[in-house]
Each structure stands twice: as C-alpha cells, then as structure tokens.
C-alpha cells in the first residue's frame, strides 16, 4: 500500500520541465517606470539637439575697465622765498646774460630754483627774482638739488654756469658744487660788462671795404700802363716789318751797276728818314705812357691831399658810447609821460638824436637800459 501511494500521487500530478514554464507577465508598475525612463531619454535627446542649433546672435562679453579714482592734487601757490644773497636781475652781468638767452634754454634752471618748469611769460622774471635758497648747506633739500644737478649733462651745466657768470671748466662734480655754492648766496663777480661785438665788426668791415677798393683801383691802373707799352711794341714791330719788306724789294729789283751807283745815295736817305720816323713813334709812345702815369699819380696825390684837408672832427667821429646813450635815455624818460610813452617811441627818439649813425643793432641795449631806469 505504501508503494502504490506514491505511484498514485505521481499519476495525479503530472511533472513538467523547467524550460516549459510560462514567462511571468510584468506588472503595471514596471510598465509605468519603463515609460518614464523612455520619456526622460527623449527629453535629453531633444535638449541636445536644441543646444546644437544656434538661434540669434552671440552675446558679447562686456569689457570691464578699471576706473582709477585719483584725488585731485591741489598745487601750492607759487611764491619766491627771500634768500641770503642778491637778486640775479640786480647783478649786471647776469642780467645781461639772461637777456641774451631764450626761454627754452632757461627751463632747467627755473626747475632747479623753484621745482617747476615755469611758463613762457614769467620764466625770465622768476629767475631774475631769485636771491638764494632758503635752506642750509647739507640739509635734505640741498642733497635733492645736488642729485637733480648730477642728472644734467655737462653741456646743460655749462650753459647754467654761463648764465650765472661762473667758470665753465671742470668735471661734472666740480660744476655741480660751483653752481650750488653760488645759488646758496648769489653775489656779483666784479667783472665789467662784455662789449658788444657788433660795433667792432662794423668798423672792421669798413676798413676791409676801403682796403679792397684801393686794391681794385691799383689793379685797374696797371693794365692801362701795360696796354700803352704793348701798343708801342706793336708800332715798333710794324716799322721793322715795313723796313724788311723794302729791303727785299730793293734786292729783287737790282739795276745795272751804273744806275746802282747813282741810286745808292737816294736809298740811304730813305732809310735814314724811316729810322727817324721809328724813333719819333717810340718817343711818342713813351711820352704818352709817362703822361698817363703822371696823371694817375697826380689824381692819387690830389685825393690824398683832399683827405688831408678834411677837418679832424670828421675823421674822429665815432658812434655814441653806452654811457652817452644812457644819459640821452635818462633825459628822454625825464621829459616823457611814462603812462603814455611806448618803448618804440623812445627808441625812435634815441635814433633821432643820432641821425648820422645806425643804432638798430643796439636796440637791445636801449631796451634793457630803459627797463633798468624805469624799475
């Protein structure tokens, strides 16, 4: 019974292979999850496609600029400190050299004195008003000025020395010390004012012109004498040729001996007459040359006598000196109204006082003296 029971059980429940089992069907939840995943993938693909398509213009990046907020520096008002020495405009030689220099050449000197380049209108005036540095030797400011001067070239230092009436010889360090020592306590050198070269050159030109004229006159006189001598030589040659031609003719036309004896005295007479004519021509030429030489010498002596006869006052006439000009300017300024009179009018009046001389070259001196007298 026990054996039959399992058999019966086997018959009742038929066995199936594992492969033949039916696949399990997915539930509703799993299907919904799959659909959501597919939708997400589609959205990602669409976004990628959109990113590839460029729509419109590209936005430019804005340039970020740095804005420096600089605080406006207020310049200190320009003041000229009173120094221990004399003002540069009061020293005659320095005032003279300042008037000769251009404003561009004085910029470095102005910067050295006042730590600023200065304007064109007030540059020379400010340099002239300088009377010395207010600080003492060996201070911090003194060292700064020394460093500033060391940066200048030798040519610039020498031009500053020229303006300040100092020696221009020496090395860079010597020039720097010389300039600083003077600027600490400016004082006059005691040398006289340099003479203007224009007046000297004018006189030398006149002398050269007069000597040149005399040389030209001598050269023109010499050819005249030579021409006279050459003309006399030509006359002599012509006479010689004529005599030689006559002699040839005589030799060709020789008659018989009898006639020759009779004609000989006639030929001698003709030759003698020709010789006398030659001598007369030579004497005339010599006399003409001597007469011309005498006339030229007479003219020269007359011109010398006429120059000697001139009064000595004419020979000794010279242009007015600086002192004379200064006195005339003083008189003109004393009689003139300074509020109405211009510099041009004063210059014209000075020229009128000396009409025989050309004083246009001394115009600068007249102007400087007027300014000195007014100040």
Swiss-Prot record:
Region (Disordered): 1-61, 184-325
Motif (Nuclear localization signal): 205-221
Pfam families: DEK_C, SAP
Acidic residues composition bias: residue spans: 31-47, 243-253
Gene Ontology cellular-component annotations: B-WICH complex; contractile muscle fiber; nucleolus; nucleoplasm; nucleus
Modified residues (Phosphoserine): 19, 32, 51, 72, 121-122, 159, 201, 204, 210, 227, 230-232, 243-244, 251, 287-288, 296, 301, 303, 306-307
GO terms for biological process, alphabetical: chromatin remodeling; positive regulation of transcription by RNA polymerase I; positive regulation of transcription by RNA polymerase II; positive regulation of transcription by RNA polymerase III; regulation of double-strand break repair; regulation of double-strand break repair via nonhomologous end joining; regulation of transcription by RNA polymerase II; signal transduction
Name under which the protein is recorded: Protein DEK
Organism, as annotated: Homo sapiens
């Amino acid at each position: 019974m026990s054996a039959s029971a399992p058999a019966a059980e086997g018959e009742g429940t038929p066995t199936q292979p594992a492969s033949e089992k039916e696949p399990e069907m997915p539930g509703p939840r799993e299907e919904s999850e799959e659909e959501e995943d597919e939708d997400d993938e589609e959205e990602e693909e669409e976004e990628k496609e959109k990113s590839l398509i460029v729509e419109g213009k590209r936005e430019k990046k804005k340039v970020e600029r740095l804005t420096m907020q600089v605080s406006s520096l207020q310049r200190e008002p320009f003041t000229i400190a009173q120094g221990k020495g004399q003002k540069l405009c009061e020293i005659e030689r320095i005032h003279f050299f300042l008037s000769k220099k251009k404003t561009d050449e004085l910029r470095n000197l102005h910067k050295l004195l006042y730590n600023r380049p200065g304007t064109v209108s007030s540059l020379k005036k400010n340099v002239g008003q300088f009377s010395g540095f207010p600080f003492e030797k060996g201070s911090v400011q003194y060292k700064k000025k020394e460093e500033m001067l060391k940066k200048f070239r030798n040519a610039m230092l020498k031009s500053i020395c020229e303006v300040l009436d100092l020696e221009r010889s020496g090395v860079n360090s010597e020039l720097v010390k010389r300039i600083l020592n003077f600027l600490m306590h400016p004082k006059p050198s005691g040398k006289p004012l340099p003479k203007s070269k224009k007046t000297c050159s004018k006189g030398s030109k006149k002398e050269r012109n007069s000597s040149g004229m005399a040389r030209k006159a001598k050269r023109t006189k010499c050819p005249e004498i030579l021409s006279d001598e050459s003309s006399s030589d030509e006359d002599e040659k012509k006479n010689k040729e004529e005599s030689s031609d006559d002699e040839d003719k005589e030799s060709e036309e020789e008659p018989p001996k009898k006639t020759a004896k009779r004609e000989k005295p006639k030929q001698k007479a003709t030759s003698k007459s020709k010789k006398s004519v030659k001598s007369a021509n030579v004497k005339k030429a010599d006399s003409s040359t001597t007469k011309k030489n005498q006339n030229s010498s007479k003219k020269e002596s007359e011109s010398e006598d006429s120059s000697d006869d001139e009064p000595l006052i004419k020979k000794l006439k010279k242009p007015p000196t600086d002192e004379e000009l200064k006195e005339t300017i003083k008189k003109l300024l004393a009689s003139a109204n300074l509020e109405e009179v211009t510099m041009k009018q004063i210059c014209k009046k000075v020229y009128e006082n000396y009409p025989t001389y050309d004083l246009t070259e001394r115009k600068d001196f007249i102007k400087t003296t007027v300014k000195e007298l007014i100040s």
